Curated annotation (Swiss-Prot):
Keywords: Nucleotide-binding
GO cellular component: cytosol
Lineage: Bacteria, Pseudomonadati, Thermodesulfobacteriota, Desulfovibrionia, Desulfovibrionales
Superkingdom in the source lineage: Bacteria
Family the UniProt entry places it in: Belongs to the YajQ family.
Family matches, as HAMAP family: YajQ
Entry-linked InterPro entries: DUF520 (IPR007551), UPF0234-like_C (IPR035571), UPF0234_N (IPR035570), YajQ-like_sf (IPR036183)
Known role: Nucleotide-binding protein.
Protein name: Nucleotide-binding protein Dde_2479
Length: 163
């Protein structure tokens, strides 16, 4: 039976490249001269930490991160910006989580949407992905189009299309 998987995977190397590009841009921009703005990326914990001298520079770094994500073809929906917190010496810090995988709630929404479409396919949740199987490839392509039209808050990729 034909099937495919719905996943939400981020390329951590591309996120690392984005952070490095933003670091270079911060080092060369005139308005960041003399400010101790720092960015660091933790691949193991999949998080980015930003340390800036004030809120304006924090917003500028956030905009640079989003712009570089688009430029490097990393969906900005993968980034989950935390609250701005006060740090030592009058600086501000923010933690940015890099979301990877489909949460249980999102997977349930996807399955519910597929079942509500009345297409002759079955959807099953497997860890952080959803497997969709059906008798016809046309039905599977209709499901892909249905899921692309809706916004689930996470970027979706469709892999392992088997016939």
């Amino acid at each position: 039976m034909p099937s495919f998987d719905v996943v939400s995977k981020v390329d951590l190397q591309e996120v690392d490249n984005v952070v490095n590009n933003v670091k270079k841009e911060v080092d060369t921009r005139y308005d960041f001269r003399g400010s101790n703005t720092e960015l660091s990326f933790d691949k193991g914990g999949a998080s980015i930490s930003i340390l800036a001298s004030d809120d304006m520079k924090m917003r500028a770094v956030q905009e640079m991160l989003l712009a570089n994500c688009v430029r490097r073809k990393v969906d900005p929906k993968f980034l989950d910006f935390g609250k701005v917190e006060a740090a030592s010496k009058g600086m501000v810090k923010r933690s940015v989580a890099v979301k990877d995988g489909i949460s249980k709630e999102t997977a349930q929404k996807i399955v519910k949407k597929i079942k509500a479409s009345k297409l002759k396919v079955q959807a099953a949740i497997q860890d952080d992905q959803v497997r969709v199987t059906g008798k016809k490839i046309d039905d599977l392509q209709d499901v892909i189009q249905l899921l692309r039209d809706d916004d689930f808050g996470v970027p979706l990729q469709f892999i392992n299309m088997r016939s």
